[in-house]
Amino acid sequence: MQNDAIKSGQDDVNSHIQMPKEVIKRFHNQYKLCCYYDVKGNFVGTKGTAESLNTAWGFFSARTEHYLGEKIETPFGKVLAYIDSLDFSQNSVSVNLNCEETVRDFMYSLIARDPVFMQEMGTDGNILSFLPEQMQHDYVAINGFSAIRRNGFLSDYLLTFQINETEIPFVLPIRGLYSYLYKGSIAINLPISKSIALCLIHKNLVDVTNKNGAVIMLSISDPDTVMDLNSWAFRMQKKRGWGYVVCPERHELDRLKKQFDSKE
């Protein structure tokens, strides 16, 4: 049952609020650290770790942590291992439907775990507002995910990969997802390393993303394109008013901070 992940009481567990540590770890540098932009503090730090960023004690119960790990994060970890085995020197790869479904489930979970989304679900007058805060988080993380999945969100999108061939690294917003216009339609990115992003393209652009059943990879060789994508990622996280933007290298975060500071 959906509510099996929810129990009463407060667990003293250090939870990753939204983005799991296994994804953040992929943005570590050679020192096993990551640079990060702190949205609330408006500063760039250089000694972040996957274990410490985006965490809070007691945010989820231990049972919900186990549920998310087993149902969402472990399957997605297997997809990441599969992606790491792909030959990106080719311009297309075969991706099975289970892989695509797992990626969507992970994206749905990221949306449901967004603290802003959770806060909106638990506003005054909603029955959730009468529950302890941890139970609210548990409920929305599980049932919000199920509702998003049931409604077929993103079902009109096809999975492809963006391969960053430039020296400018992709940045990871802790929210995970960001959207932008691609050939007149909305596209959605989820960076999984400084050089690879999962990309959902609307099915009306199927000729761009698929050829004879194989997924066409979208290679980026123009640094300006990567910087534009990073700007969308940075902007999306800042709009949430909380969280971090992560990168193995500081210079790109400094550039983005300067860009957005000049607009405020």
Locate predicted features.
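Alpha-helical structural context detector biased toward long hydrophobic helices
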Residues: 1-264
